[in-house]
Amino acid sequence: VVITTKCSMNCESCANLMQYYKSQKNTDSEILKSVKLISDNVDHISEYRIIGGEPLMNKNWAEITKGVIDQDPNRSVYIYSNATICPKDEQLEMFKGKNLHFYLTDYGDLSRNMEKTMKTLDKHGIGFYRKPAGNWVDCSGIKKHNRSVKKLRQVFKECCATELYTLISGKLYTCPFIANAANLKAIPDNKADY
């Protein structure tokens, strides 16, 4: 679930294309309505991932996350963060006893609040997983590749994100790259993509 296109970093070749967003924005207004629509029409969703950009750049990240959890308290919710921003105590208090976890990608010195974030999450009993930013995958660039149908199928089959659906701007995409390329209007709108 993309809750913002704002990011505290500007990574070249970002898999979610955040470097291409000129007017970055939060996408609060329809998120919970879209999540409810999906939840009402899918038998079981074991996990939601709250992403961005950097999700903590959305000042309403805690309320949105709580809204996702409240729709089904048994599902796990993971917030993917680069630990440049430490969540505030008052934001984390509402997650006591909730099935919330943080996935912290460690970019070394760029993740300037990593230690503070881990201490704060520990203090509130919120689980987290810290992983170094290794194995960087250059998903592609926004350009016409002129691939054959056979080659397109092969690229999709080899993609590391084929089982990660992306909810952005009220649409559920089967590919995070396509989701952001479409949201940027860098490619034509194609209903087959969502």
Per-range role (PLM):
Residues 1-79, 86:
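Conserved alpha-helical substructure of the radical SAM core
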Residues 27, 136-150:
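Short, positively charged
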Residues 38-42, 91-98:
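Acidic (Asp/Glu)-rich catalytic clusters
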Residues 53-55, 82-84, 105-107, 133-135:
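Active-site beta-loop-alpha junctions enriched in small/polar residues
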Residues 60-67, 89-94, 115-120:
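A short acidic, amphipathic alpha-helical/loop segment
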Residues 99-110, 129-133:
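Non-cysteine beta-strand/loop elements that form the S-adenosyl-L-methionine
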Residues 113-129:
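Basic phosphate/pyrophosphate-binding loop/patch that engages nucleotide-derived ligands
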Residues 144-194:
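Accessory C-terminal segments flanking Radical SAM cores
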